[in-house]
Amino acid sequence: MSKKPVAQRKQLTLSSFIGLDGNSQSQPKSRAASVRSKPPAVYNPIFLDASSSDDETTEISSQSNNGTIATKKSSRDPRTAKLKKHTYLDLSVSPLAKLSAKKYARDSPKKPTSLDLSVSPLAELLAKKSDRDSPKKPVQNENSYTYRGLSESPVENKSIGDTLRKPPQKERKTSIVWLSDSPEKKVTQNERKILDSPLQRFSFEDFPNKENGNRHHLLTLPDSPPPPQPVKKPEKTMWQNETKTIQDKDSPANPLVSNNLASISTLLDSSRAPNTYKGSSRNLFEDSPEKSGSGEQGYKLGSAKENEIPTKPATASLERNSVTSSPSPAAPLKPRYSVAFDNSLADYLKDLAQNDNFSIDPNKQNTETLKSTLGFFRNTYVELMEKYCSLIDQIPAMHFNEIAGFQPNTFLKLKVMRQKFKARTQLVQNSLDKKESQLKAEQEALEKEEIEMQAEQAQQTVLSSSSPEKSRPIMPLPKVQEIKDEKIPNRNQLIHDLCGEPDNFSPPSSPRDTQLIPKRQQLINDLCGEPDDFSPPSKQNDPHLLRKCEELVHDLCEEPDDYLAQSMMLDGDLEEEQLNGPTQGTTTSGMDDDEDDLEGLLAEIEDEHQKMQGRRSEFNGYSYKELEAVKVKEKHKETPINISLDDDGFPEYDEAMFEQMHSQAAANKSRVSSAGPSTSKSVVPTKQTSALHSQKLSGNFHANVHNDGITGEFDGQKFEHSTRLMHGLSYSFGLKSFRPNQLQVINATLLGNDCFVLMPTGGGKSLCYQLPAILTEGVTIVISPLKSLIFDQINKLASLDICAKSLSGEQKMADVMAIYRDLESQPPMVKLLYVTPEKISSSARFQDTLDTLNSNNYISRFVIDEAHCVSQWGHDFRPDYKKLGVLKKRFPNVPTIALTATATPRVRLDILAQLNLKNCKWFLSSFNRSNLRYRVLPKKGVSTLDDISRYIRSKPQHFSGIIYCLSRKECDETSKKMCKDGVRAVSYHAGLTDTDRESRQKDWLTGKMRVICATVAFGMGIDKPDVRFVLHYSLPKSIEGYYQEAGRAGRDGDVADCILYYNYSDMLRIKKMLDSDKALQYNVKKIHVDNLYRIVGYCENLTDCRRAQQLDYFGEHFTSEQCLENRETACDNCINKRAYKAVDALEHARKAARAVKDLCSGRSRFTLLHIADVLKGSKIKKIIDFNHHKTPHHGVLKDWDKNDVHRLLRKMVIDGFLREDLIFTNDFPQAYLYLGNNISKLMEGTPNFEFAVTKNAKEAKAAVGSVSDGATSSTADGQSGMREIHERCYTDLLDLCRTIASQRNVTMASIMNIQALKSMAETLPITEKDMCSIPHVTKANFDKYGAKLLEITSNYASEKLLMQAVLDEEEEQAAAKQRPSTSGWNNESVDWDMAVASQGNANTSGASGFNSFRAGKRKKIYKSGASKRYKTSTTSPAARKTTSARGRGGRAGAKRAESSASSASGWKSKKTGNSFGFDLMPLPGSK
C-alpha cells in the first residue's frame, strides 16, 4: 500500500515553538496539523532548561556581559513581545553552531546566500565572549541566540524528531526593532559600540529582502513591561511609539540604555529601505515565508496553530514599517489591496433578477418543466459561484484574520482545492475535446474512403451487369465534400422510413443522424406511399432489376460465414464498428455509420419493396451496414442461379445449412462483445439469468425500499482508491473478491458518505469498515455493544497484523494510558479503536480525546455495529445507543457507518433519525439465509427434551449448537438433562458471574462443550461459524429476534438446522412477563405484544413458506418455489404442504365467534381450550356441568381435527377477532377468551379468511410419504475412503486451531477462518504457496500458524496419493477378472436347463462372492490408508475399528466403519434376494 506524499512542514518561529505566541493556553499538544497528510509531530530542536525559574531569569538578566538573546515572538502585536532565556551545555548545540550553507530560491545570484556566522563580526564578538566567560560562568549564563525561524536556524538540518519538546516557560516582554543594511555594508562603529555596551541582550538576524536586496536586522530588548495600547495616529509609526515607550521606561534607571536606543533609532531611520507589499503573494507570517501547494505564499497546510483566531495580524507592525519609510506625520496610507470587478457584472445580475424562471410556481408545473428549471438554476448557481470566487480570490487571506471565527488555513485549503478541481476539470475537458476531434477526423477519413469504395463498387456492379441493349443510366454520385455538407442520412432512420419501426429499434444517438437531405427525403416519401412527384428510373416489372434482387439474395445466402457474423451474433464485432466508438440501441453497428451513399441501390430497393407489397423482410431488424458488410462477388459473366427461392424471393429453408450456421455461431460466441445491446435473441436468457442472479444477491425488496447498492453508483474499480483497495484486500485479508454489496459500501465510505448497511449474519459486515480503516489515515472508532465481540474482533485483527485496540474498564491503567498517548500522537498508530456506547456517553476523558483527534482530522469514521439497538421499535433497544446521536452533531464532518443484520422498515427509519444521519446511502442485502433449514415442531412438555437429546446425539460429535430457553431455570434444567443423556452441555445466563460466563463461553467456542443452553441475550456477535443447529426450547419474543438468533447457525455456509419448539402457553408466559414489568410504557408494551403475536402467527401457519414469512416482515419478496429450489434446505411447510389444504373458513370463524359471545357473556369465563372442546363436540365433565353440550354451538366443528380447531381460535386471537385476558391465580396465569375489537369486521364484513386444515389420514400419509422419500433419497458414494481422508483432515485442523486458541486465550476464529480450514481439508496443500493461495490465508497468519497446519495437510495429501494408487490398481484387477466372462454369451453348447436348475444356488453364491469382494475391496482401501498413517496393519474388523479410533476423530471413524459394514450387509442381502437372472451390477443409487 503506497504511502501518501508528505507535504513539507512549515518552518515555525522559535517563539511559536516554545509557547511565546500570545496564547496563554498554548500547550505542546495543540501544535497539530489539521490535515491527515501531516507528518509525525516535530519538536523544538533547541533543548530548553526547564529548571530555570523566573527569579533566576530576572537575576541573570540584570548581570553584566552574559545576557540572554531574546527569542523573537510570533505574536500578532510586537509590542506585547516577551523575552525568554535559553541556555545550552555547549556551543555546538546552540543555534549559532556552524552548519553547511543553505541556499534559498529567493536569493539573488549576486549576493551571498549562506548564513555563515563564523565569519561575521557578530559571531567573532560572541565567540570571544563565550571563550572568556565559559570557564567562569555557570551554564545558565551561556549566551543563547534566536533566529527569525527554523528556516534560518543553523540547526535546521538536524533531526527534529530527536529533540525534546519542553513546556513553555513564563513569558517576558520584549520589544522588536527592525534594522536594515545593504549586503555589502560591514558592521559600523555605532553597531560595535552597541555590541560592546552593557546592553548585550539583543540579536541581529540576517535574512535577505526580496524587494531591495537589503538585510533586515532584528533587535530584541528585555525587561519591558507591556505598554498601554497607543492611540492610532497617522503621524507616528509603530517603531517610533515603541522606541519612545522603551526610552520612557529605561531612561531614569539606565541612561546608557537610552543612549543606545537613540543610536538604534537613528540607525533604523538611516538604513531602513522601503519595503513595499505585494498583495497576496506575501505570506501571512513575514518571519516564515513558504510556498503553499498552489504556488502562492500563504499558510502552510497542516502547520501548527493554523486555525487559531488572532486579535491582530502578525505582520501588522511590519506592514506599517514597510509602508512608512519616513516619519512624515501627514503622509496618508495608500490602500494595500486592489480588486478588479467585471464591468458587465451589474448588467448580468440585473438580467438574472428579471429571469422568467423566478416567476414559476413549482406546485403548478409538470415534471419536464421542473427539470428544465432545476437545470437552469444549477448551472446559473455554478456560474455565480465562479464569479463570486474570482472576486474573493483577489483578497488576501490575512485580510480576514480580524474576523472572529475565521479559520485562515481552512480557507486556504478550500481555495487550493477549488483551484485543483477547476484545473483538473479543464484538463479533462481538453483531453475529451482532443479525443473527440481525433475521432471526428478519423470518422471523416473513413467516410471519405468508404464513400469512394461504394461509388466504385456501384459503378463496377452496374457496368458488369448491364448489356448494350438494355442499359440503365447510372445515377450521378455526389462528391465527398457535397455529401459532407448535405449530412448523409442515418441508415437506421432510413430503414425505419422504408419499412416501419422494428420492435427493437432505438432512436439515433445524435440530432445529426436524424437530418436527411431534401432529395433523399423526398425519395423515401415516394417509396413509402406519400404523394409521389418522383419518377423512378425504370419500370416496376423490369426483369433486369428482378435479376439484381435475386443476385443480392443469392450472395447473402451463399456466404454462410459472413451472413452468420451479422445475423446470429450477440453484438457486432467487426473492427470498423469499434472504430466508431460506443453505440446505443439494438442496431449497434449502424447507429453512427451514416456516411455511405445509398442512391445506387434506392431503385432496386423500391422495386423490391413494391414486389413484396409491404411484407417485411427478416433482414429489416438489422442495419444497412450489417447487410453491406457481406462481400459481394464480382461477376464478369452472368451465371445461372442454382438456389431455390420461395414466393418472396428468399432461399428456402435448408435444415443442414441451418445446423451448420448454428454450430458456427456457437463457436464464434466467445468473440462477441457485450458492450451494448444485441439484436440476437440468444442474449436475452443470458441477461435475464444475470439479472436474476443479481436480484437474488441484492434481494427483491418492496417497491418503496431505497437501495443504493443496485444503482451502480458505487460499482466497479473506477475510483482513485481502487488500486490500493484491491491490494489491501489481498495482502491484509487474504481475499481475492468481495461478497455482495461489500465493494459498494467500501467505495461509498471511502468517498466520505454516511452509510446504512443491512447485511445478514455472515454477510461480511466487518470487512466493510475494517478494510477502509487500514486505507485511511487516522482512527476508526467502532462502537460495539458487547465486550466479548470486541475481544474476538481485536484478536482476529491482531492475527492479521492490524493494529486494533479497545478501551474498557477492565483494562490495566498502564494499557489505557498507552492507548491515550498513542491517540494524542500524530498520526496515531491505532487504526481501529473499539469502545462500548457507555464509554462514549460517560467518559469525559475519552470525549476530550475525540475532540483532540477531530481537531487534528484524525477521526476516519464512526462505525456503529448492531445499530438496531438504537431504535426503541427494535427487539434489542439499549438506552446508551440512543445517545450516540450526539456524535453527528459534535463531529458533523466525520463519516458514519451504521451496520445491522435485522431491521424492519420502521426500525431503519428510526435508526437514521436517532443517529442524525441525513444524506445517508442505503445498502440492503437479501435477508435470505439459503443454507438454513427452518422447522417448527410441537412442544410436548418434558418429552421435548428427550427429542432434543435424541436429535443432538444423532449428529456427529464435532457438531455444536445452541439451545435457547426463556428463563434461567430452564437453562439449568436443560443443560442437566443434556449432560445426563451424554451430551456435553453447559448453561449460560445473567445469573452467573462474569468469570463463569466468560469461561463457559470460551469452552463452547473452543469445542470443549458441544451445546450451550442460554437465554436470548447470548450470541450477539459471537464469531463461531461452525454452529450446526440452533434449537429454541421456548418461543422467541419477535420474528426479528428469532431471525437473528437462528441466524447464528451456519455462518460458514454449510447446511444448518433451525428448529423451534412451539407451544401456545409460552406466549402466555411472555405476556405475563410483560404485564409484570411496570416500567414499560403503554406504547412500548403494545409494540412487544404485537411482535409476540406475529411470531405466534408464524408458528401457527402451516402452509406459507417459513422464509417467505420472515422476509416479508423485513420488506422482501420471497416465494415457496424459490424455497423448494434446494430441497435439502427447504422449510417444513414447503415440504409438507401436501398434507394440508386451504379452505375458506369465514363461516367456521363466525360460528366460533358466536360460541364465544354466548358462552363467555356476563360473568362466565372460559379458556380457549374449553371453547375448542365445545366446538369439537367433546363431552367432558366440565362441558356437561355447564350444560354446554346442549347449546347449538356444541359440535359445529366436529369434522375438523382438534389441532385445527385450536389453531383457528388462535388465529382469531392474533387477528383481533378474539382476545385473551390473563388473570393470575396463585401465580398461575389463566387466559380467558372474549370477543376482540375487530369482531365487527368478521361478522359484518367479508374478509378473506383462508385457513389450512389437515387432510384426511390417508391423503396426509401419502403426501408426507412421497415428499419424505424424495427428500431422503441419496446416492451412494463410491469414494468413501477419499471423503474420510478429507473429514479426518478437517477434524485435525479444527483440533489444532482449538488448541492454539486455548493456549492464547482467544477464540478459534481469531486463529484461522473456518472457510480457510475447509479449503485446506479439500485441497490438501503441500507448499507454502499453495497454502497462501487459499482465501483468508495471509502472510501474517501463515507466519504464525501456517507451518503446523501445513504439516497436517501434507500428511493427508500423501495418504490420499497412496489410496488413489491402491484404488487404481484394484480397479484394473477387477476389470481384468471380468473380461473372460464376456465370452460366455456366444457359447452355443451351454446347457440352459442345468443353468436354470442351478440358478438359485449359483446366483446366491455368485452374489455373495461379488458382494464379499466389493466389501473386502472397500475395507482393504481403508486399511491401506490407516496402515500408512498409523504404521500398523490389521485384518480383522475389530482391529480395523480400533485402528480408526486411534487418531483424532476416532469415535466418528468407528461409527463410519460400523455404518459402512451395515450398508455392505444390506447391499448383500438385497442382491441375494432379488437376483434371479444374470449377475448384473446394481444401479446407481440403489442399495
UniProtKB/Swiss-Prot annotation:
Its EC number is 5.6.2.4. One of its GO terms (molecular function) is ATP hydrolysis activity. The modification Phosphothreonine is found at T113. GO terms for cellular component: chromosome; cytoplasm; nucleus; RecQ family helicase-topoisomerase III complex. It is an enzyme of class 5 (isomerase). A motif (Nuclear localization signal) lies at residues 1416-1432. Its cofactor is Zn(2+). Zn(2+) binds at C1105, C1123, C1131, C1134. Residues 89-138 are annotated as: 2 X 24 AA repeats of L-D-L-S-V-S-P-L-A-E-L-[SP]-A-K-K-K-[YS]-[AD]-R-D-[SP]-P-P-K-P. A motif (DEAH box) lies at residues 865-868. Monomer. Homodimer (via N-terminus). Homotetramer (via N-terminus); dimer of dimers. Homohexamer (via N-terminus). Self-association negatively regulates DNA unwinding amplitude and rate. Oligomer forms dissociate into monomer in presence of ATP. This is RecQ-like DNA helicase Blm. It comes from Drosophila melanogaster. The lineage of its organism: Eukaryota, Metazoa, Ecdysozoa, Arthropoda, Hexapoda.
